[in-house]
Amino acid sequence: MAYPANYRYTREHEWIEIDGKTGTVGITDYAQNSLGDIVFVESPKVGDKIEKGKVFGSVESVKAVSDLYAPVSGTVTAVNEELANAPEKINTDAHTAWIMKIELSDAAEAESLLDATAYEAFVKEETGH
């Protein structure tokens, strides 16, 4: 699996693309592949305050329900409304089917996240391949 080099990643398999003080958040291709067919996405609401490492929503698949963990702290500025009617878009392209956009409280928080190379190594270590 290829992971976009300009994204940062969590060990819980979320990604964030940073653009100035705004971050776009989704789940990784590894996560969607592990979950299987996604049937529902619970997103936060615009205006919600999100704290790094805390649950901000969930993804439900035919196999399981998985919590989503915030890669950074901030205020939700947008949610991907398309996922309400078509959550399977995450299965089609996990790295463009974003879940929320967030105005970062502290851009430095993203520096502690994994880059693409480190995330790929983490996945290999976790899966044993």
From Swiss-Prot:
Keywords: Lipoyl. The keyword Coiled coil does not apply. GO terms for cellular component: cytosol; glycine cleavage complex. It comes from the Bacteria. The glycine cleavage system is composed of four proteins: P, T, L and H. The modification N6-lipoyllysine is found at residue 63. The keyword 4Fe-4S does not apply. This is Glycine cleavage system H protein. One of its GO terms (biological process) is glycine decarboxylation via glycine cleavage system. Residues 22-103 form the Lipoyl-binding domain. Pfam families: GCV_H. Its cofactor is (R)-lipoate. Transmembrane segments: none annotated. Belongs to the GcvH family. The glycine cleavage system catalyzes the degradation of glycine. The H protein shuttles the methylamine group of glycine from the P protein to the T protein. Binds 1 lipoyl cofactor covalently.
